[in-house]
């Protein structure tokens, strides 16, 4: 037993040692670059899935192991750790820093919730819509962390409103009972002595009634101190928490910058297929936005039915008088919005830069019309989405956060202190350096698989899968990704599977986007467990949910997500990217055998 305790305490260390030693026969017995690269891939994948080492530290292992096995030089590996992705990430984080610093995100969220009203069903839809919108531009984690305190305040107001309503009803009950006793005493005074004698026990029962009323009051007071007044209140709290967790993830699907998995895929894809010009911010938004909207609405219906039931009559009843709960919710949201005051100069500037950046992203090369990138036609492919992000990011360090001059008491105008919208220290606190290193490690790993020939070998071995229908291959890969992402981090999942799925598509002569796009979207479908992704963990920490609640709700959302992705792939996405044809930008795989 003591040995088991030691093993449990040192489990991470033992896992690292055992993984390295157990897999070591692979490169020792099969002496080839493919086997050596496969060994490195298995070791890194094991560490990423189990988190025996921090994810970003594991991502540095290619820089150590590839030179040791003679697959790539240190200089070559190091160059893979900083790509166009990192420039795009820096620009986006500058925007996110300014949005959160000046509370623009809170203003947007509260305004959207106020627009939809406080009916429980519409309130949850309002929270989901605002959270999803913010998650398109901010990280899923920061979005969930920002919205949850507002949701918690609304949940507390719902509970207190219920207590107030019940207290009002109890007061009315006691007053009615007292009036009834006075009437009884008048009638008793007019009756005979014999009747009075018979009514003495009845008078005693009136005291009992008073005791019962007192006892009921005590019980109500006891319940008032409890966390929830009723099961419905508890279900409402669960519903709102899960709505925030899931909508922050769903909203991230919509843009390339919405979540790290989209960014990782985009950079991997552009690196492997540099001649493909079909994937950019605008085209990604056009195909993913319908997926996100449909999934958001279906998730809302599913969660509403699961926790509160779905009463169409109550939802769409016109002229309905607001309940005490709904009035309390509206008051909380209104108070939170009023605390922000009028829109400030800093918020306006941030919003303008945000809108301009989004418009430039959309119009750079939309595909159906000529974009502004033709202005740089002499250098095709040089200007990317990261160029726009950097221009916007630099503006946040240049534009002053307040007036540059002020008037003294004597009427003189003097120069005032200059401070930009954001500072480098503030940017650093928001910059996810661990994700930047993790993505760099994924690029290095993909380069190693390409240089060693492992990618080509995997592709040749997977070519027999070409006999299966394309829809079945997509479904199988989507289900595998959805299952794996529940136990491994989303960035690690896409980083591990991209070097496998790309050769698979090439080997069976299918447009790589046909398999990679649904797999990338499904990588974000980590809805089952609190540890599956940070938004789940954030909402779980508020104490309203049990694991089984998240499993039941998440299983339904997972199924809906895969179904919506499959629907999209064979309806609007297929003609958008011409997926039924094998593209010229994808290489033809020549079958290779492993020595």
From Swiss-Prot:
Sorted UniProt keywords: Cell membrane, Glycoprotein, Ion transport, Membrane, Sodium, Sodium transport, Sulfate transport, Symport, Transmembrane, Transmembrane helix, Transport
Residues spanning the membrane: 13-33, 40-60, 77-97, 113-133, 134-154, 239-259, 283-303, 348-368, 381-401, 464-484, 491-511, 512-532, 553-573
Pfam family membership, one: Na_sulph_symp
Subcellular location: Apical cell membrane
Any GO BP: sodium ion transport
Biased composition, class Basic and acidic residues, residue ranges: 208-218
Functional note: Sodium:sulfate symporter that mediates sulfate reabsorption in the kidney and small intestine. Can also mediate the transport of selenate and thiosulfate.
Protein's UniProt name: Solute carrier family 13 member 1
Species assigned in the record: Rattus norvegicus
